[in-house]
């Protein structure tokens, strides 16, 4: 029988590191069968939120386990190496916490892949465009501009895309990713140079994606969706690293940028759902023991594991095309309102990052080079300068890291570091992280008050479902500036640019 510890006893398994700033170590024994430690990166304030969640947990049916429990349960999965890592924006999710990083040894025949370690919105990510405009150039036409963006980019639950696409096109999207969008005229050739994996995972196989998933995805290309997804017109508020910012084409306070946050829409959700059914059915056959049934998984080299990775890669390619088409529509909106070409406005992609994805990467573990399957769920790749997988333009500064804020709060551009490779498997935060559930946000917040607060900050907003904006109110989230500063202080990413929203479209 598994021993159940009281909260005070559980704290005996958690200690603060003396060597690394903002690191809490969850020792083996916190939950059964841990193969490695859990490592939580958080300052005292952010860690208190997670400790309070653990203390107040009542094991209600249907509720997620506390994030610290989830972090430790992942540490018990077969083949995991180094540690199960939680970043400062970590909060409870399906199986894995959101903000969890976990790596599995590709040379270990028992190593697993888990859809819960990627999430339902496969390759949910963020893209940032820069312009040569200053805020004073758009301030008089800001309302017109945000309305044009809202008119051109479909938003909301179940929204339909405006790009003609048949199943043949969809298969090409799933296989070729941004290569398709370049050939089809929805991306500039240079765009993919500033995307992770250059906007295409080559192991993608459209044939493993179910008809139901394809049917859901067919009409949603170039759509924003709902939830925490958004399109924002932003202005540069602070520049912390002038050299790195200039390499990215950001060199002035007040410079106008555009950030788009979306993923693989219904197609990715269905790919994840289909894989979970396959893996739940195979768990008994494979005799894999998990502490939580939401951690359904399969061995990487099993039929189920290979199928999921091929389908996940296809959904990732879909997400890159989705953001590419919205980039095309964003450029079109600026052209129509400002009466200048996107090229003349210098509307170049700064970078495109993935927040929910699994990738095969090489890392040093215990002094040895190992090929690992990296699960990043609600976290961002943060490779250092001179890493071979970084675009040539950024070799001297490290990978740009895009950290989106909540509705009405600032966003950040960071850069990756060598210390991230050493401590977090080349990973850092992705956003702010929820503190209130969506249901609780709807219960206690008034949507009119939320909208009025945005207007008082000078933020123009267009939203498809006004009553749902309470779910994304700043009060529902941790402070993104505190999250970013915690990562900066720990050395796993460096602050580069701070961006302030001036116009927002949401579902």
Curated annotation (Swiss-Prot):
Annotated Mn(2+) 2 binding sites: 124, 261, 355
Binding site residues for Mn(2+) 1: 121, 124, 229
Keyword Hydrolase included in the entry's annotation: no
One Gene Ontology cellular component: tRNA-splicing ligase complex
Residues engaged in binding GMP: 228-232, 355-356, 404-407, 411, 430-433, 506
GO biological-process terms attached to the record: tRNA splicing, via endonucleolytic cleavage and ligation
GO MF assignments: GTP binding; metal ion binding; RNA ligase (ATP) activity; RNA ligase (GTP) activity
E.C. designation(s): 6.5.1.8
InterPro entries attached to this UniProt entry: RtcB, RtcB-like_sf, RtcB_euk
Enzyme category, top tier: ligase
Cofactor names: Mn(2+)
The keyword Nucleotide-binding is assigned to this record: yes
Any one Pfam family match given in the protein's UniProt record, by short name: RtcB
Active site location: 430
Note on how the cofactor is bound: Binds 2 manganese ions per subunit.
Catalytic reaction(s) noted: a 3'-end 3'-phospho-ribonucleotide-RNA + a 5'-end dephospho-ribonucleoside-RNA + GTP = a ribonucleotidyl-ribonucleotide-RNA + GMP + diphosphate; a 3'-end 2',3'-cyclophospho-ribonucleotide-RNA + a 5'-end dephospho-ribonucleoside-RNA + GTP + H2O = a ribonucleotidyl-ribonucleotide-RNA + GMP + diphosphate + H(+)
Record key words, sorted: GTP-binding, Ligase, Manganese, Metal-binding, Nucleotide-binding, tRNA processing
Annotated function: Catalytic subunit of the tRNA-splicing ligase complex that acts by directly joining spliced tRNA halves to mature-sized tRNAs by incorporating the precursor-derived splice junction phosphate into the mature tRNA as a canonical 3',5'-phosphodiester. May act as an RNA ligase with broad substrate specificity, and may function toward other RNAs.
HAMAP family, A to Z: RtcB_euk
Additional observations: Ligation probably proceeds through 3 nucleotidyl transfer steps, with 2',3'-cyclic phosphate termini being hydrolyzed to 3'-P termini in a step that precedes 3'-P activation with GMP. In the first nucleotidyl transfer step, RTCB reacts with GTP to form a covalent RTCB-histidine-GMP intermediate with release of PPi; in the second step, the GMP moiety is transferred to the RNA 3'-P; in the third step, the 5'-OH from the opposite RNA strand attacks the activated 3'-P to form a 3',5'-phosphodiester bond and release GMP.
Subunit structure and binding partners: Catalytic component of the tRNA-splicing ligase complex.
Similarity remark: Belongs to the RtcB family.
Name of the protein this chain belongs to: RNA-splicing ligase RtcB homolog
Source organism of the structure: Theileria parva (East coast fever infection agent)
Classification lineage: Eukaryota, Sar, Alveolata, Apicomplexa, Aconoidasida
